[in-house]
Amino acid sequence: MTVTETLAQAVERHHPRLVMLCSFQKEESVLVDELVRIAPDARIVTIDTGVLFPETLETWRAFEERFGIRVAVEDATGPWTGPENCCSAAKVAALERALAGADAWITGIRREQGATRANAEPVEFDERRGIWKFNPLVDWTEQDLWRRIHERDLPYHPLHDRGYASIGCAPCTLPGSGREGRWAGTEKTECGLHVA
């Protein structure tokens, strides 16, 4: 299935009880552009930890302006006490609130992002949450993303131009390829949003 077909299926089967999670990375540049063409009123949600990069906030504004959307916010702010507490207590709890009442959610995960995502399918049942999970970009490469971003002149996160392949919270993210810049110096590669 193409990205458009996967999103159309998600919208046809689950809208308006469908949520797209948005972290304003290159994957979401493509997904938001495609999704609003199919369902301009789709619910797009971000998780604000209170320690996002200033560039993330700028990209957020650029998305809203370019795509004519209002991104809903789930607040995950609180005292930053390190990646384990922040990720599990704050981000995962915020995602659960964002998905309350939803039948399905859309993510930007791609197989080439790492071992924990290598077996992802375009459409899968999220056993942990009891809802469907759509991963329209699962087969896309980094090159595919950049080709689309440049073809359509889409807004994208400026930290990608400075060597950040994956962008999360400022205290836990360094430049690096794949997900190696996330929680650098630890074995952690996922915050818990996409892990059962």
Regions inferred by a protein language model and the residue ranges of each:
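Nucleotide-activated chemistry modules centered on ATP-dependent adenylation/adenylyltransferase
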Residues: 1-196
